[in-house]
Amino acid sequence: MSAIPSVDLQDFLSDHPQKKEKFIEDIGSAFEDIGFVALSGHFLSKELVDKLYSEIKAFFALDQEKKDAYEIEGIGGQRGYTSFGKEHAKGRKEGDLKEFWHFGQYVTDNPKLEEEYPANVTVTELPEFNAVGKETFRMLEKTAKYVLRALALHLNLEETYFDAYIKNGNSILRPIHYPPITEAPKNAERAAAHGDINLITLLMGAQGRGLQVKNHNDEWVDAIAGPDELMINVGDMLSRLTNNKLKSTIHKVINPPKEMWGTSRYSIPFFMHPISEMPLNCLENCVDEAHPKQFEDITAGAYLNERLVELGLVKK
């Protein structure tokens, strides 16, 4: 049994004031408590999800030499392929037992951001790969926009407070492959304990055991989504902005039991980032005598760079 509350986005999108109010209350309470929620009623169709899994499994099954051709130097892994074991959690030397791909923002009307963001990388071996990735990116971005609108209302802000900051934001869709484990890992996990950098994360593929979340009692609890649910969690940027009113909870992906070592695991997080200029200064209505300001002022772009250095993806 998962300890993570479930909510339905269609309640927020409905014309029913009580349903909308309850959604805001439930997601706000969950994010103030454990920092995670399981969300149904999102914009991903089963057909699109099935297509994406088919494409990413085909990509990760390519010969290593072909995959390595898509690993782009000098951009901190922001686009294209990142090979097995390259990323590690903050404070860890051991690389995580995973390889992954990054789809980034598709800027349409902002030449400055087109220049700032690296271009997406086209996989020539798989003609549908990029189109399916782009459509998934768009649907998750749309879902995230409405989740943030609900959170804005929970924080007594204008409903559209986040809209201008997330339009053309530096978001990332990351299909991850955790390959079969062939020998006992030395201190490495599929994904070591970490907090996410961004505003919120929308995770596809949390239906099986593996993802664990640390609760207030320092206990690791399973986070298991229902068949059509996304797992959504608060990232460090949103935690900073709200002076830790909304909790960015430490989580990890544990190694499977030995009898399952021969199996792959796939999961697909969407990291919702704002534009680099967004100030992450603590909101005034989240600071008072009982809750003094905990974080220095910083922009989203400067904070992201700090964290990429810590992860080993960008050199100082």
Protein language model annotation of sequence segments:
Residues M1-K316:
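Peripheral, non-catalytic segments flanking oxidoreductase cores
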